[in-house]
Amino acid sequence: MGAPRSLLLALAAGLAVARPPNIVLIFADDLGYGDLGCYGHPSSTTPNLDQLAAGGLRFTDFYVPVSLCTPSRAALLTGRLPVRMGMYPGVLVPSSRGGLPLEEVTVAEVLAARGYLTGMAGKWHLGVGPEGAFLPPHQGFHRFLGIPYSHDQGPCQNLTCFPPATPCDGGCDQGLVPIPLLANLSVEAQPPWLPGLEARYMAFAHDLMADAQRQDRPFFLYYASHHTHYPQFSGQSFAERSGRGPFGDSLMELDAAVGTLMTAIGDLGLLEETLVIFTADNGPETMRMSRGGCSGLLRCGKGTTYEGGVREPALAFWPGHIAPGVTHELASSLDLLPTLAALAGAPLPNVTLDGFDLSPLLLGTGKSPRQSLFFYPSYPDEVRGVFAVRTGKYKAHFFTQGSAHSDTTADPACHASSSLTAHEPPLLYDLSKDPGENYNLLGGVAGATPEVLQALKQLQLLKAQLDAAVTFGPSQVARGEDPALQICCHPGCTPRPACCHCPDPHA
């Protein structure tokens, strides 16, 4: 007589915890909801991401809480609203005194405590600090290879974006040191040769995975790609190949990197032992026009709380564990820490988390526990609190404000010239019928249906409850700047920033 089913399930659960999955978390930069082939773009060359979508779970309603680099990355790694941690307003810069507070617990720290070999490649943008105090090696990552902030946060005239010697478009940030490439806390090059950067990241990733396998331990790879942030770059194999200009070439290289990672995982025989998650930090920077990406049918882009700013492509791939399909369940980047902790059998940090465990949804045993989503502006304050709230199919905008990042679209509500506006009653949209947020259901409240009025009450209550519950942490950005904190490959040299130049040997 066979063992009872309950016993078999318990044994299977025990084995899952005893051997947690390898995890690869891929985070694209300034990628629009409509930029991938699997999300409907007619000409994007993204076969590897499309293959992940076909073989895994594709999310249609996956969100970030803030549509800007620094706060979005903080939310991803901690499962907490950025305002709780002081990751506001705007973004950190190379000379910022502040950064992701060290008392915050990152997903890397959660997994490292479970025995994972943890590594990060790519863009950090959560602060540098004195002696690199806020960098990844102090935030749970055993290994780090990357740029500590955005690659436009330095002078672009000394950057090569396309081989053999095409300079990057625009001036970027003048008066700063050249962007540094760091290996853990050491400067590898300043500036790096961008066309060769992706190959270095892929070699780093392969070494991490292979070393973890040799050590018989799981790995966590956080690959925070610079693609498709402006100014776009790519290697020789992709330059002028996409038919979609520099943005398309950059996207093509990102997709190829995903393919390289999947090939490496397969070559190591780890496909069925590795969970791969792909998403992005915020919507497209439409002010760049053809270099800015596409939000598809969604309204606006980066820097706004409209759908084009906060709704992101998201894929989860794990053969033998995640069934192929599409889910319309609500999900957020905030949910990744509790989800990965559950799958790894790791305890949650003893802090207030704003994320939910999505493992039942991923594994096909249940639905998403998330019932609502909250969206903050790039420059939040405690007086106004949350700008927009979604529950079920309804979304309310209590405040709106345009952003320079979303300039040049045909919709003036997206532009920086669209000033902060309070809405009473709020703008209310049925996203199941109107994902573009074009038809306000409360344009005439007297004609609103009972269902719509009930949704309005629920959304107002959710906003009031969250605003009352959330305490803003001291702003890390408001700690100000110290030019001496900028990383320099020749510490103490003069004159700065010109002397901080160490040619890349890989160029």
Curated annotation (Swiss-Prot):
Which Pfam families is this protein grouped with?
Sulfatase (PF00884), Sulfatase_C (PF14707)
- N-terminal signal peptide: 1-18
Keyword Endoplasmic reticulum assigned to the entry: answer is: yes
Question: Impact of mutating residue 119 to R?
Answer: In MLD; juvenile-onset
Q: Known consequence of changing residue 286 to P?
A: In MLD; adult type
Q: Which GO terms describe its molecular function?
A: arylsulfatase activity; calcium ion binding; cerebroside-sulfatase activity; sulfuric ester hydrolase activity
Q: List the record's Gene Ontology CC terms alphabetically.
A: azurophil granule lumen; endoplasmic reticulum lumen; extracellular exosome; extracellular region; lysosomal lumen; lysosome
Variant or mutagenesis effect after changing residue 136 to S: In MLD; late-infantile form
Q: What is the effect of changing residue 32 to S?
A: In MLD; late-infantile form
Control of this protein's activity is summarized as:
Inhibited by phosphate. The phosphate forms a covalent bond with the active site 3-oxoalanine.
* Major subcellular location class: endoplasmic reticulum
- InterPro entries according to UniProt: Alkaline_phosphatase_core_sf, Sulfatase, Sulfatase_CS, Sulfatase_N
Subcellular location(s): the record lists: Endoplasmic reticulum; Lysosome
**How changing residue 212 to P affects the protein?**
In MLD; loss of enzymatic activity
Task: Provide the effect of residue 99 to V.
Answer: In MLD; late-infantile form
Stated consequence of mutating residue 30 to H: In MLD; enzyme activity reduced to 2.4% of wild-type enzyme
**Mutating residue 156 to R leads to what result?**
In MLD; adult type; enzyme activity reduced to 50% of wild-type enzyme
Q: What is the effect of changing residue 377 to L?
A: In MLD; severe
- Where, by residue number, is the active site? 69 (nucleophile), 125
What residues are glycosylation sites in this protein?
158, 184, 350
PTM comment, free text = The conversion to 3-oxoalanine (also known as C-formylglycine, FGly), of a serine or cysteine residue in prokaryotes and of a cysteine residue in eukaryotes, is critical for catalytic activity. This post-translational modification is severely defective in multiple sulfatase deficiency (MSD).
Could you say what the effect of mutating residue 250 to Y is?
A: In MLD; infantile-onset
Q: In UniProt terms, what is the effect of altering residue 155 to L? A: In MLD; juvenile-onset
Tell me the outcome of changing residue 122 to S.
In MLD; adult type
Q: What is this protein called?
A: Arylsulfatase A
Taxonomic placement: Eukaryota, Metazoa, Chordata, Craniata, Vertebrata
Supply the gene name. Answer: ARSA
